[in-house]
UniProtKB/Swiss-Prot annotation:
PANTHER family: TRANSLATION FACTOR GUF1 HOMOLOG, CHLOROPLASTIC, TRANSLATION FACTOR GUF1-RELATED. It comes from Bartonella quintana (strain Toulouse) (Rochalimaea quintana). Keywords: Cell inner membrane, Cell membrane, GTP-binding, Hydrolase, Membrane, Nucleotide-binding, Protein biosynthesis. Gene3D superfamilies: 3.30.70.240, Elongation factor 4, C-terminal domain, Elongation Factor G (Translational Gtpase), domain 3, P-loop containing nucleotide triphosphate hydrolases, Translation factors. InterPro entries: EF-4 (IPR006297), EFG_III/V (IPR035647), EFG_V-like (IPR000640), EFTu-like_2 (IPR004161), G_TR_CS (IPR031157), LepA_C_sf (IPR038363), LepA_CTD (IPR013842), LepA_IV (IPR035654). It is a peripheral membrane protein. This is Elongation factor 4. SMART domains: EFG_C (SM00838). Residues 6-188 form the tr-type G domain. Belongs to the TRAFAC class translation factor GTPase superfamily. Classic translation factor GTPase family. LepA subfamily. GO terms for molecular function: GTP binding; GTPase activity; guanosine tetraphosphate binding; ribosome binding; translation elongation factor activity.
Amino acid sequence: MTVDRNYIRNFSIVAHIDHGKSTLADRLIQMTGGLETREMKEQVLDSMDIERERGITIKAQTVRLHYKAKNGETYILNLIDTPGHVDFAYEVSRSLAACEGSLLVVDASQGVEAQTLANVYQAIDNSHELVVVLNKVDLPAAEPERVKEQIEDVIGIDTSEAVEISAKTGFGVPDVLEAIVRQLPPPHIGDVKNPLKVMLVDSWYDAYLGVIVLVRVIDGILKKGQIIRMMGTGVKYLVERVGVFTPKMVQVDTLGPGEIGFITASIKEVADTRVGDTITEERRPCENALPGFKPAQPVVFCGIFPIDAADFDGLRAAMGKLRLNDASFSFEMETSAALGFGFRCGFLGLLHLEIIQERLEREFNLDLIATAPSVVYRMNMNNGSVKELHNPADMPDLVKVSSIEEPWIRATIMTPDDYLGAILELCQERRGIQVGLSYVGTRAMVTYNLPLNEVVFDFYDRLKSISKGYASFDYQMTDYSEGDLVKMSILVNGESIDALSMLVHRTVAEKRGRSMCEKLKDLIPQHMFQIPIQAAIGGKIIARETIRALRKDVTAKCYGGDVTRKRKLLEKQKEGKKRMRQFGKVEIPQSAFIEALKMSK
């Protein structure tokens, strides 16, 4: 028995990090009786430990709620809780495409932030109806009226029907449920009689059931025992279970048009279930697939190596398991003279990189070292071909390269105007080009074009420290453009260290090189001979530091006597040191690499 689609509401919650959207989801589940009170815990939908600790949502989660409205009808509300962070924007886009409306949650004490804007525009692009919800109105610093004005000015949507709530205490949450039923539309299209057409919203790996696929039915009926086909990959599967999340997994007989639920079909890998793909029935396929999603492209690359070489196989297995669950993460093997065997990994952004590294260390008990993050450069070769460069150590000979292009981003920064000067300075320092500046009350919104290379290092940390944590930042990839980029190598005792080489803009090369040499000088222990540490571009040395040699006091046993006796001993020592320097190898401890790489970020 399928549900009349007029009584279905599919919606997502759009908000900036920390504006309380997972807490609001908890309250909605509690008030509609989705879980018993004893089963409730904070952030029910954030199932990973790391999500709960950092207070962020990474994987989009879904839940089906039954709500008896004031008009006496019972509605089915399908909530998709989306991530708020810029790196996981692809999770947001696929979740939004499965819904018809969104709750826009804004913190009444902080107002509109950069990521609120990015996600709202995505919702508007998907032609969503929006219900404005002002959260945290019980805080002493809350200014709901000012924030309403700000929403109207910045986003340009009507806030006369905005709902004021406190998700923590539950105040105003029943009004949100009423607003969902009243203001959001039911699914627009869908016919039970049409051939099966289902949108694949998300998928994740379960040790017992294989891949669990989150789906939104558009046409037809999805039931157990059907043979389905993925239109993107052409692979066929037999549906074994059909169900919904309440947020517990509950099996149902069928899913009809407009409904959101899950299926399992003994699928082995998440990579087989491409998000945004269309699922249809093998026996009676639909004519055309849904307008497809782009598979997520990695933006930031870095090398990940085990500190203990014996952990290499464990790392390979762990990465394979994470890949099961995260199709946007890619990796391939690489070797480094300094760090041994490891992997070159691609990520959606810096937070994604940090989270994958932390999950590898935490869930699989591995000790890892990550090289400095780099972006994908395009090399225009003299023979007319174009090569992509993921690792600065693989840079071809500059004689063969006619030009190098680097990726640029369009960054939006929202900040209280007190910190504006320092933030503009930071953007200029990072080769930024200002595109726009506007004021909303006491907050400024700045738009800059920035090279991604300058952002992946420590831009976010610097921005937060300059603005004492008040500025928020969001970016979209724009395009590649040519830059005066050079490969900077670090030489220790005349030998190049591949793990520390990086591509930098010529104007900042000297500064970066000097700071790297100074750090290494403190980190590499003294040897019996002096060690030069140099930063070089091609054959030109741009910075140098020297680690002094350890030396024994050879003249200690001379009491008085002729000065030539002392000189002879000192000359002999000098001769030995010189020979040592020719044949001696510099031992660079692993800890020095780890520290240098940490700092170079």
